[in-house]
């Protein structure tokens, strides 16, 4: 079986995971390449990158503005889809520049001794608001990358066939997603969620199912003896870390928060 998209970075010396960036592409590159002086580093954005709110040409211009800085620093940026991203930029028409790429769901990143599974998607708790906004429109088949503010196929998908294929060739030790298993923070249903659930009767159940997708992925990796040790995710705009009884470290990243995944010897 074909394991899907594999990203190899044999020349990288480091890995950094970023929380949501919400379209702040220039800020991310400046922060990594200039403010922190990163070099030879793979930077993985854990969703809510901001692809889809502008026309495709906008994102090409952003890349062209930043590619010189990325090249000089020998850094690469890999984006995973969040709920505030058009899935077409990841699964149907992925961006494939040398240093600037979008990762289809169930991609594997192989670098610095790690084999990293990337799975995107989440539910927008404010989806009812977005679908009633004047800027929202139903997607057109002949314009899959047209600008919009909501995408109904935002949810994550459990794909056992892809996991089976991955298991034949890889031993996953790290996973990067946008949201997280159901036992990870945040687990409260207050604030904006409670407000939005009043006008979206399916929201509570849909979010429950969304989190269970990652429960199933975790169960699959465990039952197939993958040496999972790290899980990174964003989505909740807060920072949190915990280690479970199996020794897996879960890392929730705040907006633009950066966390290093240490290279293996």
Question: Which stretches of residues belong to each language-model region?
Answer:
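Binuclear metal-dependent phosphoesterase catalytic core
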Residues: 9, 110-112, 216-224, 236-265
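Extreme N-terminal starter segment of soluble prokaryotic enzymes
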Residues: 11-16
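Active-site neighborhood of phospho(di)ester-bond hydrolases with catalytic His/Asp-centered motifs
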Residues: 17-19, 43-48, 76-84, 102-104, ...
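Core catalytic region of metal-dependent phosphoesterases/phosphodiesterases
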Residues: 18, 23-112, 207-210
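Short, solvent-exposed loop/turn segments at secondary-structure junctions
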Residues: 22-24, 49-52, 84-86, 121-125, ...
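A short acidic (Asp/Glu
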Residues: 27-29, 54-57, 89-92, 129, ...
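Glycine-rich phosphate-binding loop signature in dinucleotide/nucleotide-binding domains
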Residues: 35-39, 168-170, 225
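Active-site-proximal loop/helix segment associated with metal-binding centers of metalloenzymes
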Residues: 114-212
């Amino acid at each position: 079986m074909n394991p899907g998209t594999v990203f190899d970075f044999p020349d990288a010396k480091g890995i950094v995971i970023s929380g949501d960036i919400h379209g702040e592409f220039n800020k991310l590159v400046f922060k990594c390449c200039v403010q922190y002086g990163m070099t030879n580093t793979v930077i993985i954005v854990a969703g809510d990158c901001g692809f889809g709110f502008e026309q495709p040409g906008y994102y090409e211009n952003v890349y062209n503005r930043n590619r010189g800085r990325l090249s000089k620093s020998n850094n690469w940026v890999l984006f995973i889809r969040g709920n505030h991203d058009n899935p077409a930029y990841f699964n149907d028409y992925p961006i494939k520049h040398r240093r600037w790429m979008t990762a289809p769901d169930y991609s594997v990143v192989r670098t610095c001794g790690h084999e990293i599974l990337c799975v995107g998607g989440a539910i927008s708790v404010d989806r009812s608001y977005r679908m009633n906004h004047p800027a929202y429109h139903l997607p057109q088949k002949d314009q899959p990358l047209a600008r919009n503010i909501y995408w109904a196929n935002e949810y994550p998908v459990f794909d056992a066939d892809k996991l089976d294929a991955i298991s034949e060739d890889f031993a996953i030790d790290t996973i990067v997603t946008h949201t997280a298993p159901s036992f990870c923070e945040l687990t409260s249903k207050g604030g904006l969620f409670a407000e939005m659930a009043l006008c979206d009767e399916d929201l509570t159940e849909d979010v429950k199912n969304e989190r269970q997708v990652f429960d199933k992925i975790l169960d699959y990796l465990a039952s197939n003896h993958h040496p999972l040790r790290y899980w990174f995710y964003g989505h909740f705009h807060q920072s949190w870390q915990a280690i479970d009884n199996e020794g897996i470290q879960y890392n929730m990243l705040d907006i633009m928060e950066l966390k290093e995944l240490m290279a293996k010897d």
